[in-house]
Amino acid sequence: MGLFDAILGNAGEMSAEDATEELATILGPEEQIELAYKLIRDMIVLTDRRLILIDKQGVTGKKVEYRSVPYKSITMFTVESTGHFDLDAELKLWVSGQPSPIALEFNGKTNIYDMQGLLAAKIAGK
């Protein structure tokens, strides 16, 4: 992920190994990370069991919010790909009990279709 993408607030891919190391304390027994994305300090992680949104807060980033979303709670999602003048892709997730969708932006280098495919399979129960 480049500096320009970081300034714009767009997530880029990160390795499952790095994400596993960073999230070792919150992953369940035998829970495996399948895809991970990083945005400056925040992260978006898809495991074999759930979607995890990590929000590091404050100047030092010591305060961290972990939002765990079971795949069965996702009722719908949309994917918006990059265009000629729109350099970022967007994913919107509608979660049961939430009035508005969770919107996530990704840089143009990120293969948003990998995430879309994994989400579609998980929501379908595969």
Language-model segments: which ranges?
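Anionic N-terminal interaction surfaces
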Residues: 1-44, 107-109, 126
